[in-house]
């Protein structure tokens, strides 16, 4: 599959899967940044977490200092991982191939919607191993390691990754019901990655999937029993019901967007910060 058709077919799955392309070897013009800098330059990751923290605070009507650092760090990692994994899973389901080399991928550090993602044109045309597996072993692992070094539990971070994979499969299934079996099978295969062992229960890409850790976004909830995501491990526990409608058909599609509105993936952010950012 050539670069043009694959990019167009990914865009048909929704904005979370959309990618742009650029000529290999170019220096990214502003506001684009190289993905490698985010993964390997601590100051860039610190800035992103701070940006997300400010966004969470503004969305919830509170001061940035009232948002715990580890909550912002978890949400930032979730959004970044999800934005990378969605097009990779989409490409795999569509029978294409997408290589996300951190040194060649560009991104735009913006909030309030699916942030821009650009890859070299050759990244969409050269066949290779399963794109999701390579992404998990490379950039996603690097990002999880960098955030874990900032006192965020690796269990939480890999739970975020599992949730992102399941959410991407759910969105593919909603956009293309004919691809639902392939999307769920690809997600299940991705969840066999060693670091994801025990990260979730139930079939990924459906409302029956539950992660075994919490992304921590509930800590910004307006009150007890609110602000839980549809796939949260806390859903259904006494005094902590999930958000309304979490088990209705289509609820799984919202799981990703509910938590990562301010990280650049769009959608709502649970019951407590539903307003969209500018």
Q: Could you say what each language-model-derived stretch is?
A:
Residues 1-47:
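A eukaryotic "domain-start" boundary segment
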Residues 36-207:
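Hydrophobic, aromatic-lined core segments that form the binding pocket/scaffold
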Residues 174-248:
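Cys/His-clustered metal-coordination modules, chiefly Zn-binding fingers
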Residues 249-252, 257, 263:
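Short linear motifs in low-complexity or flexible loops
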């Amino acid at each position: 599959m050539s670069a043009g058709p694959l990019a167009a077919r990914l865009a048909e799955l929704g904005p979370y899967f959309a990618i742009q392309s650029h000529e290999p070897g170019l220096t990214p013009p502003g506001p684009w940044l190289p993905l490698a800098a985010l993964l390997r330059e601590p100051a860039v990751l610190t800035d992103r977490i701070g940006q997300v923290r400010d966004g969470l605070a503004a969305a919830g009507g509170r001061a940035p200092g009232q948002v715990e650092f580890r909550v912002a760090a978890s949400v930032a990692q979730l959004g970044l991982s999800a934005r990378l994994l969605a097009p990779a899973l989409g490409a795999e389901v569509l029978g294409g191939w997408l290589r996300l080399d951190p040194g060649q991928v560009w991104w735009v550090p913006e909030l309030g919607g699916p942030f821009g993602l650009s890859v070299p044109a050759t990244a969409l045309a050269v066949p290779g191993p399963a794109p999701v597996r390579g992404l998990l072993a490379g950039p996603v692992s690097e990002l999880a390691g960098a955030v874990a070094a900032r006192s965020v539990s690796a269990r939480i971070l890999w739970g975020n990754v599992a949730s992102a994979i399941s959410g991407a499969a759910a969105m593919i299934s909603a956009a293309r019901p004919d691809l639902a079996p392939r999307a769920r099978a690809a997600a299940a295969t991705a969840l066999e990655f060693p670091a994801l062992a025990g990260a979730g229960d139930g079939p990924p890409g459906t409302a029956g999937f539950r992660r075994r850790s919490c992304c921590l976004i509930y800590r910004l909830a307006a009150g007890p029993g609110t602000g839980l995501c549809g796939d949260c491990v806390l859903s259904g526990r006494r005094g902590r019901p999930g958000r309304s409608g979490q088990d209705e058909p289509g609820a799984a599609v919202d799981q990703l967007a509910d938590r990562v509105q301010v990280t650049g993936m769009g959608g709502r952010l649970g019951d407590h910060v539903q307003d969209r950012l500018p």
